[in-house]
A protein has these predicted regions:
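Extended hydrophobic secondary-structure segments that form protein cores and membrane-embedded regions
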Residues: 12-15, 42-44, 234-241
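Short polar catalytic/cofactor-binding loops
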Residues: 17-20, 244
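Short, charge-rich binding segments
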Residues: 43, 227-230
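A short, basic/flexible loop-to-alpha-helix module at the beginning of a structural domain
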Residues: 1-5
Length: 304
């Protein structure tokens, strides 16, 4: 049986997180989809991403070039391009490069040197200003054959370099991370970058797996309640965590406990998704100049 045919049997599937999820889950779901229809789909962390893709694929199962045929291409897209999908905010690029250097290094010593080198490359001006006084002293001492001062200059350069980098990292933590919500990569394509960011790619994947065309509205939970060709409803549930409240939540929520702020969400979601939420959501009433900034999420029944 192919993945475009309607299986007689159904099954439920729950996927947990993990760094290999983007490669392992899609192919596993494609194989299962040959025999089963996914009725209830759940996921946490990276598994929630796979769950959303699986729900979209089940929705688009009868549509040519959509459904699980689209999902089958994911490993080839993610494997070679995963790093380019994670695009840091420009101000936080040095921190991101330090993080990547640490991941690529083998062993604690190599990791320390790799992160230090990435910090020097990322914060060149601070590094130059930190090392300059010591270098000047060392050069003058060398020309004067004042060996004691030469040692002092070399030591001052080393101390100055480390102090300057420490100051610059502290500045990044205090003044650059907070405006970016303490995250390095917003998810969408950043200025000057050619490939899509991870969120752009994921939004497109969901649309294509569901059989949606460019310009079509985003796939919603309401759509999953009434798939095409009279197929049974697809129940999708995902678990996320509110760090501020220190508690988990299950999506979709059934009440208006949360609203979203347009200016914040423009940084992390594709324009088509945010425009849909604004057009179908209800404004959150406030009594100041932020009247049009906050919206409740659209009602599930209205998004079909």
């Amino acid at each position: 049986m192919t993945t475009s045919q309607k299986p007689a049997e159904s099954c439920d599937i729950v996927m947990k997180g993990g760094i290999t999820s983007g490669v392992v889950y899609p192919l596993a779901m494609v194989e299962l989809a040959k025999k089963f229809r996914f009725a209830n789909i759940g996921g946490t962390s990276a598994g929630a991403i796979a769950a959303a893709a699986a729900a979209a694929a089940e929705y688009g199962r009868p549509i040519q070039d959509a459904g699980f045929a689209r999902l089958e291409k994911v490993p080839q897209e993610v494997g070679p391009n995963i790093l380019s999908m994670f695009q840091p905010s420009p101000a936080l690029t040095p921190l991101f490069n330090m993080f990547v250097a640490a991941l690529r290094a083998k062993g604690k010593t190599e990791r320390s040197f790799a992160m230090f080198a990435a910090a020097v490359r990322g914060y060149r001006l601070a590094a130059l200003l930190g090392v300059a006084p010591g270098v000047i002293i060392a050069v003058i001492a060398l020309l004067s054959t004042a060996w004691g001062w030469l040692c002092f200059g070399v030591l001052a350069a080393a101390v100055g370099l480390n102090a300057a980098l420490a100051w610059r990292l502290l500045k990044a933590a205090n003044t650059e991370l907070p405006p970016n919500d303490y995250g390095l990569c917003p998810g969408i394509r950043q200025c000057g970058s050619a490939p899509d960011g991870f969120t752009d790619w994921l939004a497109l994947l969901i649309q294509e797996a569901a059989g949606r065309k460019p310009g079509d509205p985003p796939l919603t939970f309401g759509d999953l309640d009434a798939p095409p060709d009279g197929a049974p409803a697809i129940n999708l549930a995902m678990v996320t965590t509110s760090l501020m409240e220190e508690r988990p939540y299950t999506l979709p929520m059934q009440n208006e406990r949360f609203s979203f702020r347009i200016s914040e969400w423009r940084k992390i979601f594709p324009k088509e998704v945010l425009d849909f939420l604004i057009a179908n959501g209800r404004p959150f009433e406030v009594e100041n100049d932020e009247q049009e900034e906050f919206f409740y999420f659209p009602e599930r029944s209205s998004c079909r």
